[in-house]
């Protein structure tokens, strides 16, 4: 079926078809002359459909011929995507040749049926001490990652990818939504150097691409992750940045003629976010655990975009510049980060009590810092001096050498299981290492 372009509004293109030949919603249309795909969004009457362009509309003109493919946008899925960079259409953009795929999947899929989903309180061991102790990941859960530039978001993501691949025999999918091209490029080459590239699929919709690409690229990556899950794997899904997904939706919504809601966001914000997040779930075959980088506009947590995202999260990890300045990596703030899974019924009484004791010591140390700076340690009570010394040891013990950081630090990476993590922190709290210098706790795995 062939139609003709009748109107172009930025990324929005209106196409007229003959009566009884109107394409379905989400059908892919193709403009051969420009090698450009469109996706049908609305049927607006008079045999006209309104579409999103998944590419630049520069040079398009009215009355160009448009072909209805009679199919939705399909992306290659499976092991053929590992180690490759794909765009929103599932085409490789890494100059490493074509992807030979036996199977393609639509980017718009329904979430698993309730009867197919598996709800468990199983904790996903990451091998990173501070995460496993204070903000454990739920297998199949959703984790929000807050952090500015240069505090270690990328290196943390790379270590998680490595640990899931090597220790759990799983795989990862990284979706760059509105990514800076430089960041995506750096991420690719750093993972190549760290030998984890063959365990991850990369799907990029870069910052310079039209809003249609940035809005749909998350769905392309999600379809690839879902296929790995159905293959029986534990999948770690990274989305960077979930805010830019919302922003792309805002741009498209205005062009589609929808009335904006609070702060200018699209009226369908909650629905769009829900459709994306509901697909991230565990089934009888495997699990998808997602780590989502979240930008908070003007540090306003009540902004509709982050507040809509928060409702879906199980854990929150905050990367702190103050901790990074102390040279403690990963620079995760133990007092700001939290997890709903830190519950005695899920992690056990011992884990819960030790985690709370660690937080108490660190909070007390934080409160005493001003006193120490003015009067010195000697003016503190004997009990407070013990708390401060142990808290400093705990703080340094949160540092950990990463496998993916070996090429930078020269220190061999360490994977620490949850059992060892709990025991080591318990020993520090009990005073078994009170006579050992705090420097000895820096950049080690288990004691």
From Swiss-Prot:
Its main location: membrane. It is a peripheral membrane protein. This is ATP synthase subunit beta. Belongs to the ATPase alpha/beta chains family. InterPro entries: AAA+_ATPase (IPR003593), ATP-synt_VA_C (IPR055190), ATP_synth_F1_bsu (IPR005722), ATPase_a/bsu_AS (IPR020003), ATPase_alpha/beta_chains (IPR050053), ATPase_F1/V1/A1_a/bsu_N (IPR004100), ATPase_F1/V1/A1_a/bsu_N_sf (IPR036121), ATPase_F1/V1/A1_a/bsu_nucl-bd (IPR000194). It is found in: Cell membrane. PROSITE patterns: ATPASE_ALPHA_BETA. Keywords: ATP synthesis, ATP-binding, Cell membrane, CF(1), Hydrogen ion transport, Ion transport, Membrane, Nucleotide-binding, Translocase, Transport. Its EC number is 7.1.2.2. It catalyses: ATP + H2O + 4 H(+)(in) = ADP + phosphate + 5 H(+)(out). It is an enzyme of class 7 (translocase).
């Amino acid at each position: 079926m062939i139609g003709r372009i009748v109107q172009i509004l930025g990324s929005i293109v209106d196409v007229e078809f003959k009566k009884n030949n109107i394409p379905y919603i989400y059908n892919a249309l193709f403009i051969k002359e420009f090698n450009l795909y469109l996706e049908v969004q609305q049927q607006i009457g008079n045999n006209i459909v309104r579409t999103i362009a998944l590419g630049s509309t520069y040079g398009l003109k009215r009355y160009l011929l448009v072909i209805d493919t009679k199919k939705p946008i399909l992306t290659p899925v499976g092991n053929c995507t590992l180690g490759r960079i794909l765009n929103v259409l599932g085409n490789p953009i890494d100059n490493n040749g074509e992807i030979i795929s036996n199977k393609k999947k639509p980017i718009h899929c329904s979430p698993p049926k309730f009867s197919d989903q598996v709800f468990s309180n199983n904790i996903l061991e990451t091998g990173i001490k501070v995460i496993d102790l204070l903000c454990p990941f739920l297998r199949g859960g959703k984790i929000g990652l807050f952090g500015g530039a240069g505090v270690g978001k990328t290196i943390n993501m790379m270590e998680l990818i490595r640990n899931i691949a090597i220790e759990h025999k799983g795989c990862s999918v990284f979706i760059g939504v509105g990514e800076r091209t430089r960041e995506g490029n750096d991420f690719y080459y750093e993972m190549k150097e760290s030998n984890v590239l063959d365990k991850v699929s990369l799907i990029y919709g870069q910052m310079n691409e039209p809003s249609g690409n940035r809005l749909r690229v998350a769905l392309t990556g999600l379809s690839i992750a879902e296929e790995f899950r159905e293959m029986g794997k534990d999948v770690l899904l990274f989305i960077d940045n979930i805010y830019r997904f919302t922003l792309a939706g805002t741009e498209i919504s205005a062009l589609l003629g929808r009335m904006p809601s609070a702060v200018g966001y699209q009226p369908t914000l909650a629905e769009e976010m829900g459709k994306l997040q509901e697909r991230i779930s565990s089934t009888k075959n495997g699990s998808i655990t997602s780590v989502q980088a979240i930008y908070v506009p003007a540090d306003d947590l009540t902004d509709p975009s982050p507040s809509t995202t928060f409702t879906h999260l199980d854990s929150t990890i905050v990367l702190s510049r103050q901790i990074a300045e102390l040279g403690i990596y990963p620079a995760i703030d133990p007092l700001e980060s939290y997890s709903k899974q830190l519950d005695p019924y899920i992690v056990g009484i011992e884990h819960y009590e030790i985690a709370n004791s660690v937080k108490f010591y660190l909070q007390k140390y934080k409160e005493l810092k001003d006193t120490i700076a003015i009067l010195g340690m000697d003016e503190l009570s004997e009990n407070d001096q013990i708390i401060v010394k142990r808290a400093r040891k705990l703080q340094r013990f949160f540092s950990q050498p990463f496998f993916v950081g070996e090429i930078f630090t020269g220190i061999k990476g360490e994977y620490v299981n949850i059992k060892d993590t709990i025991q080591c922190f318990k020993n520090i709290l009990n005073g078994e290492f009170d006579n050992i210098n705090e420097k000895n706790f820096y950049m080690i795995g288990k004691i």
